[in-house]
Amino acid sequence: MRRRTALLVASATAVALALGGLLGGVLAEAPSAGPRPAVESRALAQRALSPAGGSLTGTAVGALEAAVRARPRDADTLVELGFAYQLRWRETGDASYLPLSETALDRALHVRPDDANAVLGLGSLALIRHEFRSALVYGRHARRLLVGSARPYGVIGDALVELGRYPAAFAAFERMVSLRPSLASYARIAYARELTGDREGAEGAMRLALEAAGGQPESTAWALVEISKLDLSLGRVDRAERLAREAGQALPGYPSARIQLARVEAARGDDQAAIRDAREAVAALPTQQGVALLADLLDRAGRPSAARNQRRLVGVIEQLLQASGVRVDLEAAGYRADRHIEPSKTVELARRARADRPSIYGDDALGWALARAGRCAEALPWARRSLRLGTKDPLLYFHLGYAEGCAGNRAAMRDWYARALELSPQFSVRWAPVARTALGCS
């Protein structure tokens, strides 16, 4: 999973920090059987969502739902419930929580039309659903309501990044960190540096984010995983493994740490361990990226039937996300292009994705789909455009190399394949072996 996906997930929930520490909250006290008065139910939910470690549970959501039933026009509780549903989605992968979040936040705005936290909640929901133009509108509205606050700039900057408006996005991130240095703001600075090719600077900013986590378990684990991803992308396998294991120790059972450990083990060639850890991760949190990794690992291990089962699950997850309003064209186009599924339809899917997300990764998705469809001359400009920021992403390098080879430029193909492997020798379970074979490497 590319880091931008993880950052969008984090972005979609980080704004909840101002609402009682929703990010990474825990169930501090389980309710006894029977109904509770509204005030007591809400107090329980607030304790359940406090930043004391662990993760949000369905019981906390239930407590907020009880409070809303007792006081249906309590805008504050409706907003907290809206964010809680988003966090529940993040923890479980169950996209049916997203329409519930929208309903709760819309109800809060009906009660209190200029509730800035409700507007931010809808902005974070739009990011989750990949509705980036809507997210930008909500972020700017929240900025007008919260003059001098850092929080709206996260939503604004994240939306601008996905819309390919990089100077404005990076300015938003700089403004955010100047207003409030925090895990959320440092993580965005790190991503901006990564996009512009400054991977060492990105790691430095992520270490500031780790310090800002202050030992809070989920925030610490998340930051450790992101630093591990950076190290793995730079070929620092030992450091990446150590950090992934530290993340699992900081928050036992954390699926993101487990899937990152699977990536590291795959890079080492330890497919048995990678399959084991990927299975555990997707059993806890079945994401498209995690399941696709497991399918690729099973294929590499010579277990095609098991791999097919996982690929079917990817399709089911995609359908469930779409049913809950999440736009998955970009991710679906990349997945299908990788596997050469209906190339012409994949090109059209990639065109829609790029129209929605005219970023370097939108460019890459369209170029990759065109190259895999054999439309080489059309693919090259998009593949080249994907590197316009100087991003050091081995998969972007590989995709450009493939497009060059498709167009008959064999020397350029070999050059880009070599760059990809030099940057990260095991950059992809599926494509690193292809690059090595093309270069005559063992």
Indicate residue ranges for each PLM-predicted region:
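N-terminal leader/linker segments that initiate helical-solenoid repeat arrays
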Residues: 2-111, 116-117, 137, 425-426, ...
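Start-of-helix register in tetratricopeptide repeats
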Residues: 76, 83, 117, 151, ...
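Residue-level recognition of tetratricopeptide repeat
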Residues: 83, 87-90, 124, 158, ...
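Canonical tetratricopeptide repeat
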Residues: 80, 121, 155, 188-189, ...
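TPR-repeat structural position
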Residues: 57, 91, 98, 132, ...
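Register position in tetratricopeptide repeats
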Residues: 87, 128-129, 162-163, 195-196, ...
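Short coil turns that delineate tetratricopeptide repeat
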Residues: 72, 113, 147, 180-181, ...
